[in-house]
């Protein structure tokens, strides 16, 4: 078992390093690689969600292909809209896809059509929309130029993941050392207040480094972003734990050796991304 634990640790480490390298590389390389990567991630995560609820939720049978296409298309549509390559007409096929999801249940004679609707729509709101909103972070309209020019700023979407990774790592280390008070025992027995606060401090600390190198936001705006990401990331993590608890599964999938599934890896970002978008819009209103 000692050997097994070690090989599992090595497997986890290799997967973790590759995962971070691919994510960081694709976000930084070009807006095109960013788009391709997250269309694939959206599709895989939604497919995994569909597989999970089909296997584990009573009488549920969602159309994995359609919800997967929906998530991928929503990402593309929001991207096209954000880079000014398309106007709002680009969302019409998506609306038709949602209508198809509703109407098809009339004819499919499945066991539990209402739950199929519910889980299908949830896949779009809970997974499709947050990933699509990454485009709002990544692309910026420059109204000052006479041509409508859109610039790609990889640092904002990347910073979300940096804050989440650092806060996770910090929470794990600090929680293991001094964690006494349980954060949310009913849903996630391992998390401690000490770990979560420690992880938050690590992430906010890193925001000062980002503020130094990328001064398009002030130090306090960066720190606020880190705080929002950490708090909502924790809720995102707990939300997915609640989902898995209700479905009686330990991991959402097996695609990542030693790391469970796609949902396990992106659970915290699914709430952190929309929260970050709202926070950054709020800064422009103040």
Set out the residue ranges of the language-model regions:
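Short, conserved aromatic-histidine micro-motifs
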Residues: 220-224, 259-260, 266, 285-286
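Interfacial loop-to-transmembrane junctions
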Residues: 246-269
């Amino acid at each position: 078992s000692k050997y097994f634990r070690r090989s599992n640790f090595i497997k986890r480490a290799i997967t973790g390093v590759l995962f971070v390298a691919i994510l960081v590389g694709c976000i930084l390389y070009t807006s095109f690689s960013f788009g391709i990567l997250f269309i694939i991630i959206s599709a895989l995560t939604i497919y995994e969600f569909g597989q999970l609820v089909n296997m584990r939720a009573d009488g549920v049978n969602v159309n994995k292909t359609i919800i997967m296409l929906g998530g991928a298309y929503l990402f593309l549509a929001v991207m096209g809209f954000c880079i000014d390559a398309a106007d709002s007409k680009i969302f019409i096929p998506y609306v038709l896809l949602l209508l198809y999801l509703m109407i098809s249940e009339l004819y499919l004679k499945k066991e539990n059509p209402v739950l199929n609707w519910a889980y299908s729509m949830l896949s779009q709101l809970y997974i499709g929309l947050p990933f699509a909103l990454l485009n709002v972070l990544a692309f910026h309209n420059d109204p000052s130029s006479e041509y409508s020019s859109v610039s790609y700023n990889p640092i904002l979407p990347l910073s979300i993941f940096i804050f989440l990774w650092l806060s996770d790592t910090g929470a794990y280390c600090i929680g293991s050392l001094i964690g006494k008070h349980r954060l949310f025992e009913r849903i996630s027995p391992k998390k401690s207040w000490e770990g979560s606060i420690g992880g938050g401090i690590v992430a906010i600390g890193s925001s000062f480094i980002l503020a130094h190198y990328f001064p398009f936001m002030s130090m306090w705006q960066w720190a606020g972003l880190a705080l929002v990401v950490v708090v909502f990331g924790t809720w995102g993590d707990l939300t997915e734990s609640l989902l898995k608890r209700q479905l009686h599964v330990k991991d959402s999938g097996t695609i990542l050796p030693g790391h469970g599934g796609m949902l396990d890896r992106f659970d915290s970002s699914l709430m952190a991304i929309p929260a970050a978008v709202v926070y950054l819009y709020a800064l422009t209103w103040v």
